[in-house]
């Protein structure tokens, strides 16, 4: 009996042990229909190179549980071509003034809901509240403003540059970078000839083209994305450059100076807009409002060292950036500039000459 009782006891204990193990397995088994973690939204930005502080972008990603995909273009025509090929792939783009007009005419931009942009309404600089290219500000928000001129390294360029005509001097052969931008490059030649940036006269545009063919001998590269780095590293002596980029170069290399040519130049503003059919329109609106928060804007523009369109943020920025001589001189001479306009079908003439200029065909 004792043996039988012992046997029964062992069987019962063994059974209980198995049951206990089975229960443990059931407790740790994941439910078959466990909810998956929501994937982060992707905000697709198509813009100019170096146009945001990476930390400012990272902070927006963290606050909004999203990821930012950032792609760059070299000029407005490249942006337009990409948009025509499928602009809904992007949520935010940054066209310049005249390109905003073109895109509005082509129905490429979403109208903005300004009730969701209180930071913009409160902080946008007064001079850009009703720009000629979008007077009611229905489709865009100004972001960066500036003027185009000539940056030069005084270590190599002994006589200060004062004129567009100086670029043609033979001693600068192989030492000049021009912007990789059709309208910008033709503007400098048109101004040299005393003509408007927006000329649609075939004779004037062809005359500008002939001047540019002569200038090609002196050109090291047509470059918009890396011209700052090449000037800072002294790979080039002279660059056809935007005032903000020249200021950026000057901080890293004080030998770099900036000239607003005496013949006049062009003034510009780059803007933020939302393409028609953007997949993440609400997230894009949040981003536009975020970028116009004064503290965010001050941090962003301290990084970029560009002229800020956020009036409230400017006093919050580092003094050495706001008072940089290049930016101050460019602002003082903005009356020497002419806005670019949409030139309609005349752009095909510019495009033809531009292709020939860069390829020799």
Protein language model regions, located:
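Early extracytoplasmic/lumenal segment of secretory-pathway proteins
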Residues: 30-102, 229
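Extracytoplasmic ligand-binding site segments that recognize negatively charged/polar headgroups
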Residues: 53, 89, 94-235
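A ligand-binding cleft/hinge motif common to bilobed small-molecule-binding domains
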Residues: 99-102, 232, 238-255, 305
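Ligand-binding "clamshell"
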Residues: 104-111, 131-138, 248-260, 321-324
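Periplasmic-binding protein-like
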Residues: 206-214, 252-276, 322
């Amino acid at each position: 009996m004792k043996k039988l009782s012992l046997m029964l006891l062992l069987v019962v204990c063994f059974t209980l042990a198995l049951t206990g193990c089975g229960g443990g397995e059931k407790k740790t088994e994941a439910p078959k229909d466990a909810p998956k973690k929501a994937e982060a939204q992707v905000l697709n930005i198509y813009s100019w190179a170096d146009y945001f502080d990476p930390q400012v972008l990272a902070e927006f990603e963290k606050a909004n549980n999203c990821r930012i995909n950032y792609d760059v273009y070299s000029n407005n025509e490249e942006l337009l071509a990409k948009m025509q090929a499928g602009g809904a792939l992007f949520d935010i783009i940054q066209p310049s003034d005249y390109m905003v007009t073109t895109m509005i005419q082509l129905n490429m931009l979403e109208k903005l809901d300004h009730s969701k942009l209180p930071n913009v309404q409160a902080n946008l600089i007064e001079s850009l509240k009703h720009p000629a290219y979008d007077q009611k500000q229905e489709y865009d928000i100004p972001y960066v403003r500036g003027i185009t001129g000539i940056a030069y390294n005084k270590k190599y360029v002994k006589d200060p540059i004062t004129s567009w005509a100086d670029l043609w001097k033979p001693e600068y052969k192989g030492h000049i970078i021009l912007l990789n931008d059709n309208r910008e490059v033709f503007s400098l030649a048109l101004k040299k000839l005393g003509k408007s940036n927006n000329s649609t006269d075939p004779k004037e545009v062809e005359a500008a083209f002939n001047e540019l063919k002569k200038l090609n001998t002196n050109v090291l590269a047509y470059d918009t994305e890396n011209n700052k780095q090449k000037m800072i590293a002294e790979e080039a002596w002279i660059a056809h450059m935007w005032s903000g980029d020249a200021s950026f170069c000057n901080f890293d290399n004080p030998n770099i100076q900036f000239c607003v040519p005496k013949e006049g130049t062009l003034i510009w503003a780059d803007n933020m807009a939302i393409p028609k059919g953007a997949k993440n329109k609400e997230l894009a609106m949040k981003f536009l409002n975020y970028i116009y928060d004064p503290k965010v804007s001050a941090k962003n523009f301290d990084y970029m060292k560009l002229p800020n369109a956020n009036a409230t943020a400017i006093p919050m920025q580092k003094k050495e950036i706001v008072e940089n001589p290049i930016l101050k001189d460019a602002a003082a001479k903005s009356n020497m500039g002419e806005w670019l306009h949409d030139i309609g079908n005349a752009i095909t003439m510019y495009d033809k000459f531009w292709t020939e200029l860069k390829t020799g065909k």
